[in-house]
């Protein structure tokens, strides 16, 4: 490698400074004479420069080694016959490294990412009190939505994608018109942080859960609170509605999951088994039923339907799969080294993906109850994950302030 005259001068003076700082007097004098260096050296300018250059080289070497490892793994996958997206069923597509896009723009940790149900855009929310809209295919930033005065905790679209709901630590829920990007209404009534929000399938009602230990049902047209669900003994972290709109699930700091009837408004079941705060829940689509039945050894008589099934993730590092009808935990998925923060089912039903504070996302093959792939996804806690219902993309968000788009194949 050929150094420029300026680089040569920097190197000579940096070596001289190093010899001087180490007390190598004889070597220093000889080096000064051979390298034509004046007797006096500007200590401030060159102090520690050689050590800094050396540590920079070490860091770059490590980065190169990491990149080489990722390249080798990708090459090995291709050469060992891992099917490409064109040659395998979409039911078998799973996210693979490296990420397609790494999106930056938020000034504080990412709290939620969600795909739009129709358009090729996604929305992210952050502790910086803002929401950002991105084109997940191109990676382009489109616009920022502002209105909350504290951390935005959760996001949800209605089935048409015309409305976006956001919940916040400012104790409010906002409903946004996703065509004009204006806040249509602000829902007030919770007494603490509103940690979760979701629409009922009809789009007529909205549910929100809060640190005030309650779940509220809101009429979307009027913004009125029409019912207040009580039963959890601590912070209600998440609320989720079954695809047919008949049942609601909620999870809490009280280490339980509750199943509620939305017609009678009664708590039907309390699911116990986790040993710490239950951070997240997700209803399994019907496409998962056959794989969950195989995994649990359940034989379903002809003409009968199984399920519904629910997944829960906890700070105890465990994911549990529940039969909601019997209130039984069918099996547990163990493998994360830290809190489980997010869950998303593959639309094809074979896989469940999870996000964790161990900085990874894991892809679980439900039939065999095993982790089939683990991705080092972020440089800090992975707080949220979403799996597109029809396109081959997964998105994740992290405390490292980035959102990543992963392509599936």
UniProtKB/Swiss-Prot annotation:
It comes from the Eukaryota. GO terms for molecular function: dynein complex binding; microtubule plus-end binding. One of its GO terms (biological process) is establishment of mitotic spindle orientation. Residues 56-81 form a coiled coil. WD repeats lie at residues 105-146, 147-186, 189-228, 231-270, 273-332, 335-374, 377-409. Its main location: cytoplasm. Positively regulates the activity of the minus-end directed microtubule motor protein dynein. May enhance dynein-mediated microtubule sliding by targeting dynein to the microtubule plus end. Required for several dynein- and microtubule-dependent processes. Belongs to the WD repeat LIS1/nudF family. This is Lissencephaly-1 homolog. The lineage of its organism: Eukaryota, Metazoa, Placozoa, Uniplacotomia, Trichoplacea.
């Amino acid at each position: 490698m050929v150094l420029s005259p300026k680089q040569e001068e920097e190197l000579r003076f940096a070596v001289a400074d190093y010899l001087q700082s180490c007390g190598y007097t004889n070597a220093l004098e000889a080096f000064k004479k051979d390298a034509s260096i004046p007797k006096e050296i500007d200590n401030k300018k060159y102090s520690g420069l050689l050590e800094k250059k050396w540590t920079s080289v070490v860091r770059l070497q490590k980065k190169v080694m990491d990149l080489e490892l990722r390249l080798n793994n990708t090459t090995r996958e291709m050469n060992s016959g891992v099917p490409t997206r064109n040659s395998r069923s979409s039911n078998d597509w799973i996210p693979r490294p490296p990420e397609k896009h790494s999106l930056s723009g938020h000034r504080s940790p990412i709290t939620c990412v969600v795909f739009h149900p129709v358009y090729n855009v996604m929305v992210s929310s952050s502790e910086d009190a803002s929401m950002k809209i991105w084109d997940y295919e191109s990676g382009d930033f489109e616009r920022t939505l502002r209105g909350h005065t504290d951390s935005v905790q959760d996001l949800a679209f209605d089935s048409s994608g015309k409305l976006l709901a956001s919940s916040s630590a400012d104790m409010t829920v906002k409903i946004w018109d996703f065509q004009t990007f204006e806040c249509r209404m602000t829902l007030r009534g919770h007494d603490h942080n509103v940690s979760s929000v979701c629409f009922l399938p009809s789009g007529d009602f909205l549910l929100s859960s809060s640190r005030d230990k309650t779940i509220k049902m809101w009429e979307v047209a009027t913004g009125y609170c029409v019912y207040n669900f009580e039963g959890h003994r601590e912070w209600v972290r998440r609320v989720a509605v079954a695809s047919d709109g008949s049942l609601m699930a909620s999870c809490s700091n009280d280490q339980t999951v509750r199943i509620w009837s939305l017609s009678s408004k009664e708590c039907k079941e309390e699911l116990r088994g986790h040993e710490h705060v239950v951070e997240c829940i997700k209803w399994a689509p019907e496409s998962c039923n056959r794989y969950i039945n195989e995994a649990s050894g359940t034989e379903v008589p002809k003409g009968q339907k199984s399920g519904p099934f629910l997944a829960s993730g906890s700070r105890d590092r465990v994911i549990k799969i529940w039969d909601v009808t019997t209130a039984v935990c069918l099996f547990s998925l163990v493998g994360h080294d830290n809190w489980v923060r997010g869950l998303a089912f593959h639309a094809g039903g074979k896989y469940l993906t999870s996000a964790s504070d161990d900085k990874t996302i894991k892809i679980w093959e439900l039939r065999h109850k095993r982790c089939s792939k683990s991705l080092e996804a972020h440089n800090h806690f992975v707080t949220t994950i979403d799996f597109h219902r029809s396109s081959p993309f997964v998105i994740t968000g992290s405390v490292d302030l980035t959102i990543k788009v992963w392509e599936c194949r």
